[in-house]
Regions:
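Acidic, polar-rich low-complexity tracts and alpha-helical solenoid repeat scaffolds
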Residues: 17-304
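N-terminal secretory signal peptides that target proteins for export/translocation
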Residues: 1-2
Length: 304
């Protein structure tokens, strides 16, 4: 969720690309890797096990099984005391099941960590969300009293931060610090207010901003958040399309891009962009020159 955690989002995304041609991995593969790691706890074996868990989490469609895999990953990361990895998996758990007791514990822990690290906007949004998600929790009243009154209007606060993206811009036309902060608060809002009508829109704006920052792993994770948890939202088709477009043009992964484009056509066959997506699939991997030549050649063909 927080911007500095995007490295693991990128890691999980790259893993999904490597395994895109496979079905859900068998659980006994995880058991084998886990046994290997326990008998020889090297960083390499840890990474292999974590990658397999990450891959399975991305592919698993059953909510209960996915939750078990996430918790298993968190326990593994606890052994190495890697807070960033723990938090990243914890955030996935909160997305999946925000009302669980485990999610509640991690949400408060992450909020407190953000507060300690000076990310006050993120911390306060998470804490306000905590009090709204768990109003009967014994800690909620005290937390509520610690949140500044400016956070009573979160949408206004987020919009104000959005305007600051272009204050004192750098050579790329944006204020990087404010842009990263905007991404953070949009994610924070969606995490604690998953059912709010504005959440998917905030995630989409955050994805576009992270792409402007060239943080492609983060962008992919945000598009996936939208398509996974908000499949019926108006932003979902565009999020899926832009994921494919980013894969093709920024990450130079035409095979994965084609897979995403085909998924788009399967899910949204009557979408206004279907014709454009078909064109992209037909010409994927071709240079602009080759595409132009093909178009010109088509124009010269006699009409039937």
């Amino acid at each position: 969720m927080m911007y500095r955690l995007s490295i693991l989002c990128c890691l999980l995304f790259l893993i999904s690309c490597k395994n895109s041609d496979k079905a859900v991995e068998q659980m006994d593969e995880i058991a084998i890797l886990e046994t290997t790691y326990k008998s020889n706890p090297t960083l390499e074996n840890f990474n292999l096990l974590l990658q397999k868990l990450g891959s399975n989490i991305l592919e698993e469609g059953d909510k209960t099984k996915k939750e078990a895999l996430i918790i298993r990953s968190i326990e593994l990361c606890k052994e190495t005391k890697n807070t960033a990895y723990i938090n990243t998996f914890a955030i996935e758990l909160i997305k999946l099941n925000p009302k669980s007791e485990v999610s509640k514990t991690y949400l408060l822990s992450i909020a407190e960590e953000m507060k300690s690290s000076g990310k006050n906007e993120v911390a306060n949004i998470l804490m306000k969300g905590y009090t709204d998600l768990y109003p009967d929790d014994a800690k909620s009243e005290g937390i509520k009293n610690s949140i500044p009154a400016t956070y009573n209007n979160l949408n206004g606060l987020i919009n104000d931060l959005g305007t600051k993206i272009f204050e004192k811009p750098d050579v790329n036309g944006i204020n990087k610090v404010n842009a990263e902060k905007y991404v953070d608060v949009c994610e924070s809002y969606a995490l604690v207010y998953p059912n709010d009508s504005l959440s998917a829109g905030y995630l989409f704006k955050a994805a576009e901003m992270s792409r402007a920052l060239n943080s492609y792993g983060k962008t992919i994770s945000l598009y996936d958040w939208i398509t996974t948890y908000y499949p019926n939202d108006k932003n979902a088709p565009m999020a899926l399309f832009l994921k494919g477009f980013l894969l093709e043009n920024d990450l130079k992964n035409p095979d994965k891009a084609k897979e995403i484009y085909e998924s788009f056509l399967s899910k949204y066959p009557n979408h206004a962009m279907s014709k454009d997506v078909n064109f992209l699939i037909t010409n994927i991997g071709k240079s602009d020159k080759e595409i132009i030549e093909k178009i010109e050649k088509t124009k010269t063909l006699p009409s039937k």
